[in-house]
């Protein structure tokens, strides 16, 4: 069933690309695929039982490249299942949002179905080569999404995105080869590499391999100072491109930390833990302060992504500091995975709403609008909910995630409290943006602004509802994540 979930969108992409059909049929086909994916997701989630340490649910393994110890291997645990669910939900929201797309809708549907398969493959993969193949192809998919449906300077932004992230993937590949060479017997199987931890007692060699893996994943996350591709990519990407980029693709980097770097290179991770914490703190504060200076709504949201992903980096870094209690480090990792899901839902909604501004008036400038609450109450209401969810107000998933991150991280490494002002700065910038966009007399580009259409509302509202459900009833998600977090912390402590 898991392989069907992964490859069904790819099959749909091939059909959409080859078979000529009316635009409406292509849109319906895309929605049908997303509906089928949601059904499969529900079946997987309800059928999921927490596997024992070192095992996986819904595991499948087929020989692929036996000469180098690589196979098509997929499976789910508490780290991957939430991100698979996030991927399916975000892509479904994008399919609904794109219902009225007039520019090559069949090609767009085919491309995003392809991209969905690649993203699902990254989170389901249990072989390092399979992970890398899906990881790399997702870069190509997003490149064409920005180039083909972007605005502003899409060619330049797409090229910068591709070159920067592709360079990161090459560095990541070097790290993977280092793990393979050190393993005895040589293998790319994640479970075997985790069991062996082949570079555990290798000194500086393990540090070099971890550095390669960290840099490759940090570029995709992105963390400071590897973030410079992100703002232009978001600014010039279409709304659904930004939603997928922020909601799903950025999680590949942080997922790689907990799936590959931490369990396979535990000794090196512990040695680098304080550096990782420092990068997380800098990313939190830098992302918040630079976001505060933005006048472009999309760039502002992009920099808040640097801030929010910085919390994840900070938490996984704290998990490598053994001076803290094991329970606190487990809470930090649980918070990190919860933050990945939370940020994906909320930021995807924010980027879709920002896309409405550009679609209606061709501008993301905050000062070009004012008093939007009067002509567009649905837009104003959902934007306000998304903003408050993003700043971490209780009742939403962001609060659950950040509370766990700081509770666990401060216990292990009190210096992580230096990142707390980032929450205040993000609150200030979102409240200021809401005041400028929504309140006061209707002026500028807000005059005669068309409120959200039904398809736009149906795309955004479920994302925010998901954040609310996690914020109020987090147990269904935490019960999945917590056992896997304990395993990761135990592996890092070896």
Regions found by a protein language model. Give the residues of each.
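Central hydrophobic cores of alpha-helical transmembrane segments in multi-pass inner-membrane proteins
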Residues: 3-19, 31-44, 84-98, 115-117, ...
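Membrane-interfacial loop-to-helix junctions in multi-pass inner-membrane proteins
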Residues: 21-37, 101-114, 129-132, 150-171, ...
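Transmembrane helix-loop-helix hairpins at membrane boundaries of multipass inner-membrane proteins
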Residues: 1, 15-112, 189-194, 486-487
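Juxtamembrane/interfacial segments at transmembrane-helix boundaries in multi-pass membrane proteins
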Residues: 49-70, 137, 169-227, 232, ...
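Predominantly late transmembrane helices and immediately cytosolic-facing juxtamembrane segments
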Residues: 224, 347-353, 414-448
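Alpha-helical multi-pass transmembrane bundles of energy-transducing inner-membrane proteins
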Residues: 23-24, 107-114, 118-202, 290-363
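Alpha-helical transmembrane segments of multipass membrane proteins
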Residues: 13-18, 95-96, 117-121, 144-145, ...
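Structural signature of hydrophobic alpha-helical transmembrane segments
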Residues: 1-8, 76-87, 128-141, 206-219, ...
